[in-house]
Amino acid sequence: MTGNIVARRYARALFALGKKSGLSDLETFGNDLAALAGTLETAPELVRMFRNPVFTPDEKRNVIAKLLDKLKVCPTVRNFCLLLADRERLAFIQDIQAYYGILLDAEKGVIRGELVTAIELANAKRDKVKAQLEAQAGRKLELGFSVDKNILGGVVLKVGDRILDASLRAQLGILKDNIKRGE
């Protein structure tokens, strides 16, 4: 819980800094943070090192500085990450990046979602479904598609914290419950 609060505060601070400069800087910061978070995801030993109190802030700062040099991030993100190192907050980079992405999407009027189907959809069908959902939402939609044969048929749509389960599996579950209750 505390980590989430810390991550949100730092993400909002970086976002406010980028917002003063314009949308291009907001996106640059987001891309740089995403690259850094992706690198940390592939190297979990770095995250463990950032969380380990045995390493001094200077040692952590040196490691993150070398990593940032390799990633060629913008100076603002570099200074931001070095500040995180000084304040012993490097362990929150991935959470900061995730929340920053949410803020950036809100600024651009984009909502993210995922559509789960029982079979793979053709590209034309994907585009049509996405266009219909965008029309209903009135906003741009970044929609990921995945396949889960366990839903048997229909779709499960996840957008933000909402889930619309129109799968055959869910319908059969409702029918089963109704039969058990004698309705």
UniProtKB/Swiss-Prot annotation:
It is found in: Cell inner membrane. GO terms for cellular component: plasma membrane; proton-transporting ATP synthase complex. It holds the Pfam family OSCP. GO terms for molecular function: proton-transporting ATP synthase activity, rotational mechanism. It is a peripheral membrane protein. PROSITE patterns: ATPASE_DELTA. Its main location: membrane. InterPro entries: ATP_synth_OSCP/delta_N_sf, ATPase_OSCP/d_CS, ATPase_OSCP/dsu. Disulfide bonds: none annotated. Keywords: ATP synthesis, Cell inner membrane, Cell membrane, CF(1), Hydrogen ion transport, Ion transport, Membrane, Transport. F(1)F(0) ATP synthase produces ATP from ADP in the presence of a proton or sodium gradient. F-type ATPases consist of two structural domains, F(1) containing the extramembraneous catalytic core and F(0) containing the membrane proton channel, linked together by a central stalk and a peripheral stalk. During catalysis, ATP synthesis in the catalytic domain of F(1) is coupled via a rotary mechanism of the central stalk subunits to proton translocation. This protein is part of the stalk that links CF(0) to CF(1). It either transmits conformational changes from CF(0) to CF(1) or is implicated in proton conduction. F-type ATPases have 2 components, F(1) - the catalytic core - and F(0) - the membrane proton channel. F(1) has five subunits: alpha(3), beta(3), gamma(1), delta(1), epsilon(1). F(0) has three main subunits: a(1), b(2) and c(10-14). The alpha and beta chains form an alternating ring which encloses part of the gamma chain. F(1) is attached to F(0) by a central stalk formed by the gamma and epsilon chains, while a peripheral stalk is formed by the delta and b chains. Belongs to the ATPase delta chain family. This is ATP synthase subunit delta. The lineage of its organism: Bacteria, Pseudomonadati, Thermodesulfobacteriota, Desulfovibrionia, Desulfovibrionales.
